[in-house]
């Protein structure tokens, strides 16, 4: 997003050094309290492993503001994980790039050409789809029920591509 001149607010991580490292890399702010980041963001990307999505959502749900979009850059979990989103006044979705992330300081360069799937609340899906397509990415909407199968297929296929390329380079 930074390479496309998106207006980024910053990062929060339970490991403050990791948030500061990401913030320095993207020339944004590192937040030491999640409330600050939630309060200042119109779109909030949660980039945790699936096992932490629900606990993180439960922590920030009461901090979210009306019309905010919450987007999980997900594995196998769908936007159904965001229980109580309607009552909180937020629109939630999950977005999944067909891309392996092997290095946090270089993998982002491949995002420009990545294919994404998105599912969730219609408003969130539309906003995220518009954002990604404005950057030149191809986006496909999928059904939440298909999310686990999609993730499994994406993991296998993207890892096979890496293995084939590695074999080719040898």
Where are these regions (language model features)?
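Short, hydrophobic beta-strand segments that form beta-sheet elements in well-ordered domains
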Residues: 9-13, 70-73, 116-119
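NAD(P)-binding Rossmann-fold cofactor-contacting core
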Residues: 3-26
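Rossmann-like NAD(P)(H) cofactor-binding subdomain of soluble oxidoreductases
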Residues: 30, 34-106
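Glycine-rich beta-alpha junction loops
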Residues: 15, 74-77, 99, 122, ...
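Short, structured coil segments at secondary-structure junctions
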Residues: 4-5, 25-27, 66, 87-90, ...
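A structural preference for short, hydrophobic beta-strand core positions in alpha/beta folds
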Residues: 10, 30-32, 141
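Hydrophobic, well-ordered beta-alpha structural blocks that scaffold small-molecule cofactor pockets
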Residues: 2-3, 35
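Internal alpha-helical scaffold of NAD(P)-dependent oxidoreductase catalytic cores
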Residues: 18, 22-25, 89, 106-170
């Amino acid at each position: 997003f930074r390479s496309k001149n998106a207006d980024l607010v910053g990062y929060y991580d339970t490991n403050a050094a990791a948030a500061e490292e990401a913030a320095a890399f993207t020339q944004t702010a590192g937040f030491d309290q999640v409330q600050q980041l939630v309060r200042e963001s119109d779109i909030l990307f949660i980039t945790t492993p699936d096992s932490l999505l629900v606990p993180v959502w439960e922590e920030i749900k009461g901090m979210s503001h009306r019309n905010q979009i919450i987007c999980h850059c997900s594995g196998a979990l769908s936007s159904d994980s965001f229980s109580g989103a309607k009552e909180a006044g937020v629109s939630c979705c999950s977005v999944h790039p067909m891309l392996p992330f092997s290095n946090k300081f270089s993998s982002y360069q491949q995002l420009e050409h990545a294919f994404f799937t998105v599912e969730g609340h219609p408003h969130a899906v539309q906003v995220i789809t518009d954002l990604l397509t404005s950057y030149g990415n191809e986006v496909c909407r999928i059904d939440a029920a298909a999310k686990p199968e999609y993730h499994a297929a994406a993991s296998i296929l993207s890892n096979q591509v890496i293995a084939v390329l590695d074999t080719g380079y040898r």
